Regions:
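ATPase nucleotide-binding head domains, primarily ABC-like/P-loop NTPase cores
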Residues: 79, 83, 94, 214, ...
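Alpha-helical coupling/stalk and coiled-coil linker elements that connect catalytic or binding modules
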Residues: 1-266, 274-275, 279-303, 326-327
Length: 448
């Protein structure tokens, strides 16, 4: 189950107690910065961790200028003056070398500190603590890292003269005594061994954020349901499904008992939008445990693949037809694994009618094997008769009354029975001679 599924009780509390949710969101918002995404780089990238021998060398070099100055005062030997100058020069080089390395962390380290700080506040709330009961111990284990990272001087706003003077003297101390270089080296020793715990905190904070977002998202929907598993005899079921991005979307219902779905109908009638609604609902069910329907039931572990809006590629030298051929080939390969939901729209538009119908029939028969479910739309009503034993047939249709074209967007059983494409051209003001010639051509082609 997804992380959302196992935390439905928390979602229920967030939905019923909006004041609590608002308070939690105020804490979450404190990490609402474009630099926050850079925290992920601390979890995966290779970091400039100094070797222990180099770290010990830094500890020795930080005392060379002071020791040289002391020995110069005691002995008055010019050699110790040269040693002090060389030591200061070496420390200066090492300081700026380390400072250059740390520029890559100018954004991520401050945001990591902010993440740890805000996560500690969230962990004090019983509801948030129930997201990850181990998080308190993890945060406690990161206190030493947090203190070490807090010593970073990753940059400072020089807003007035006093701050400028303070920064100048601090930078001198860091340059000559390697304070910053040593501190950052020790911090990255700690960081390298704490990445898994940092990732756990990152996931904790992110999951709390997601739960609040899902709670608000559900409230914005006209209605929703939780996904379920198919009842006996069912292979797929959805009741009153709608697309969340379509205002006043007309809902539709379909239940399958072993077959797939082939949808016919004219353009703009709702075929593609319905198929997209199925895909969006299944994705939301898997990721957010939220369905845009009164009820939504599908087989456990069902995976989604679609070929709805494909384009040619000039850069890759692929035509629309070749792009579609390669995509459908991948889907056929996936179909052998079984338990897939395939969504297809207008198969093989880039070839002639006879071969398009023949190829589409063969492909659609192949895809439904191994317990796969297919939702496909087509203008080729010939496919309905070829696939009637393997697919449940549905259609969308338009209404033409008094020269006005309208759609009800309701899914209806059976294949489409009327052809209104030429009628739509007439309504849209095409020249009458074009319309009449089209009607004549229909009669001729139907006799071929």
């Amino acid at each position: 189950p997804s992380a959302i599924t196992v935390h439905e009780d928390i979602l229920h509390t967030l939905s019923s107690d909006t004041t609590l949710r608002s308070d939690i969101q105020k804490e979450l918002k404190k990490l609402n910065h474009s630099d926050a995404c850079s925290i992920a780089s601390l979890l995966s990238a290779d970091h400039p961790v100094s070797s222990h021998s180099f770290y010990r060398l830094l500890r020795v070099l930080q005392f060379v200028p002071v020791l040289s100055l002391g020995l110069l005062y005691v002995t008055s030997s010019v050699w110790f003056l040269w040693l002090m100058l060389v030591g200061l020069l070496v420390n200066l080089i090492l300081h700026y070398r380390k400072k250059t390395e740390m520029q890559a962390y100018l954004f991520s380290v401050p945001q990591l500190l902010n993440l740890l700080k805000q996560s500690e506040k969230l962990a004090k709330r019983p509801l948030c603590l129930s997201v990850d009961k181990e998080i308190t111990g993890v945060l406690a284990d990161l206190i030493s890292l947090r203190k070490r990272l807090a010593s970073f001087r990753m940059g400072i706003r020089l807003e007035n003269d006093l701050v400028l003077i303070a920064y100048f003297f601090t930078e001198l101390l860091n340059m000559f005594f390697l304070l910053e270089a040593i501190s950052t080296s020790r911090a990255f020793f700690l960081l390298q061994g704490k990445q898994q715990k940092i990732e756990q905190v990152f996931r904790f904070f992110g999951l709390v954020d997601v739960l609040c977002s899902v709670s608000m998202f559900r409230e914005s929907l006209p209605y929703h349901s939780l996904p379920g598993r198919c009842r006996e005899g069912e292979s797929f079921h959805v009741a009153d499904i709608y697309h969340p991005l379509i205002d006043h979307c007309v809902s539709n219902t379909v239940t399958l008992h072993g077959k797939s779905v082939l949808i016919t109908g004219s353009n703009m009638s709702g075929k593609t939008s319905f198929i997209r609604s199925i895909g969006v609902c299944q994705l939301a069910a898997e990721a957010l445990n939220t369905c845009f329907a009164r009820s939504f039931r599908y087989p456990s572990g069902m995976r989604l693949a679609s070929a709805i809006h494909m384009e040619d590629s000039l850069l890759e030298g692929k035509s629309f037809f070749l792009q579609e051929v390669q995509t459908i080939k991948e889907m056929i390969d996936l179909s052998r694994e079984g338990n897939h939901l395939f969504l297809l729209d207008e198969l093989f538009k880039g070839t002639n009618t006879v071969e398009r119908i023949a190829i589409a029939k063969a492909v659609l028969s192949a895809l439904i094997r191994q317990r796969n479910i297919v939702f496909v739309s087509t203008h080729d009503i010939e496919l309905a008769s070829l696939l009637k034993d393997e697919y449940d047939l549905y259609h969308f249709c338009e209404n033409v009354e008094n020269g006005v074209l309208s759609f009800d967007y309701k899914l209806k059983p059976g294949p489409v029975t009327e052809r209104n494409a030429i009628r739509i051209l007439e309504i849209c003001g095409y020249p009458q001679e074009v319309v009449q010639e089209a009607y004549s051509a229909v009669g001729q082609t139907s006799q071929l």
